[in-house]
């Protein structure tokens, strides 16, 4: 993959349940011969004991035109198979996936936590760059008591080869990783 840019819009609903809207933009570069029909994206449907109430809003190309996709479930994930079984993709392709979830914050006695794996650890291809922007609603932004942290590397590693910055954009706090 050339890149992944993800925007996470985190808020609370009227019942104080966390809401998450996600917009992911994957840029894949395929060979110029018939090899690939698209990509698969596995999105979690559960976190710990919580059912995340995942809803796919759209799957589009770089021109906001809907892409064909099918879904299947595997290991507490909804897997999107994006592409056409009858045609190959070549060159640079953009896949923008928009979805929503609920109940993504874990509440503890001393603190609350939103723990998210931006691009997962099951990809066969490397990513040139990965950027995540977390847009916090005002009611959540005021409750941040610690500096957000990020980790990089393979599953189980805890390297921090990444940077974290925070800025105000309108009434939201945006954390960029």
Which residue stretches match the model-derived regions?
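Lumenal/extracellular ectodomains and adaptor appendage modules
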Residues: 1-177
